[in-house]
Amino acid sequence: MANIWVFIDQFKGAALAASWETLGAAKKLAADMGGATVTALVLGQNVEGVAKESFEYGADAAMLCDDATLADFRVRPYAALIARLYKEAAQKPDVILGPATTRGRDVFGMAAVELGTSAIADGAGINAKDGAVYVTHPAYAGKLLSTVVAKTRRPQVITLRPRAFPKPEPLAGKTGAISKVEPALKEDEIRTMVTGYAIDEGKVSLADAK
């Protein structure tokens, strides 16, 4: 059976809506692939609640890394962990999906390099055919839609545009198995440090604009 992994982008223990949209798209893609298993990748600190919530939005299973090195977003430890999980997986995913948020784009670009595969960014539509995933990709400021496919490289690493897919209705009380994993890097192996956040007041995130 095919496998799909979905990176759940979160901030301070709260998942972004785009993550649940991506999870919903993954479930539809799984049906196209004949019933693939959808696994949520939840990375951060104090995020076990997000892993549990992922089942309500369609995840069949979840992998959780809850560690201080992932408390603040730094692309290297996140990408290194996704790459390591893929390399060590007994049943490797055919596809790794994530939301095309700032963090999602950064993580997937670096993870694709570490895995020696291609990355398809900012998908606005997705479907499976003959073992490959076809992604509708907007070009020229959305005036043209192209179809992109990675026919030979695996895993297929894809980010999906926020609000391009509907957010699924949560199934309250749905549960599943959570596999806890260790981080790929120790703190002294990470070269960057987050010292704080600057809030830009009066502006709305484009990802949340209605």
Functional labels for PLM-detected ranges:
Residues 1-210:
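N-terminal glycine-rich FAD/FM-binding segment characteristic of electron-transfer flavoproteins
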